[in-house]
Amino acid sequence: MERMLLLSPPSLAARPERLNTILSSHSRYATDLQMLDRVAAGLVSLPQSTYDIVMLLTDVDGLGTGSTSAMGRGVIQSVVRALRPGGKFKRENGTFPSTECPDNTELMLAGLVFDDTGGLLKPDFGPENIVPLKLGKRKPVHSVSSNGTGTSGPHVNMQLSTGSMLKGQTTTIKGVGFVDFTDDPSLSEADIYSGQTDDELIDEETLLDGEDMGRPIIQPPECRPKAGKRRRACKDCTCGLAERLREEDKAARAKADATLETMKLAPKELAEVDFTVQGKLGSCGNCALGDAFRCDGCPYIGLPPFKPGEEVRLLSNDVQL
């Protein structure tokens, strides 16, 4: 019994009486019904090589424009896979247009062909057969035997069961040929791999003259400094910006190191202040000169100038100016 698949456009879903009329004219045991929009959306997958006939139903208006517009490439490929070899794909209201119609391009690209009745047919190429390929006979190789006579036939390495060669016959095993890519065939292999050849080496510096060396270096736009930002060199800078920035950083680092060297104090230049012993001065040496010359953390802040080592006394807790 032939299996049939009915593809219904979405407009027939609102007319159940129309669907019942169509289904009543076909066998319910061998007929399946699928909505075209669900197949196009991928919600329904059609079984492969199952149906002998796939019929595309028309719309409610009978024109078939809705069903034709929903037949995309994915739906056509699903229909072709669902057809058995030799199966037919046809429309309810008649045949498909001629092969010159642009709407049939996807149908023909999917592998369907037009039959005599105007429908589309999936070709049946029959079962796959294995075709043996016969190789031609090997051409005989002409060789010269030990006695000087020419012989023809395949070059066979003949050996006895004991592994010894036949007396009076010598065989030569042909190896794999190598291709020599050198231009000079007179060079030995050692000279080629060692690089000792007569080829003249060209110094790159001789290719530039004084005029070329004096030309200004054209700086690419991406290497030019931007306003408010420090210039940065590219990763593979060739305009000299990387070397210039490296020299500037080196000079700035040397200047900072020189400044730090002048600020360093030797151990002999450091003095420890002990305020419990009279006659000791601070490391700045300005403690006795007054507040104008004292440091922020000096313990003598607020006291009048005094001589080093002199005991200062304030009478009646009055500040002496």
Curated annotation (Swiss-Prot):
[2Fe-2S] cluster binds at C223, C234, C237, C239. Monomer. Interacts with TAH18. Interacts with MIA40. Residues 132-213 are annotated as: Linker. Belongs to the anamorsin family. PANTHER family: ANAMORSIN (PTHR13273:SF14). A motif (Cx2C motif 1) lies at residues 284-287. The C-terminal domain binds 2 Fe-S clusters but is otherwise mostly in an intrinsically disordered conformation. The N-terminal domain has structural similarity with S-adenosyl-L-methionine-dependent methyltransferases, but does not bind S-adenosyl-L-methionine. It is required for correct assembly of the 2 Fe-S clusters. Its cofactor is [2Fe-2S] cluster; [4Fe-4S] cluster. The keyword 4Fe-4S applies. Residues 223-239 are annotated as: Fe-S binding site A. It comes from Coccidioides posadasii (strain C735) (Valley fever fungus). [4Fe-4S] cluster binds at C284, C287, C295, C298. It comes from the Eukaryota. This is Fe-S cluster assembly protein DRE2. Transmembrane segments: none annotated. It is found in: Cytoplasm; Mitochondrion intermembrane space. One of its GO terms (molecular function) is 4 iron, 4 sulfur cluster binding.
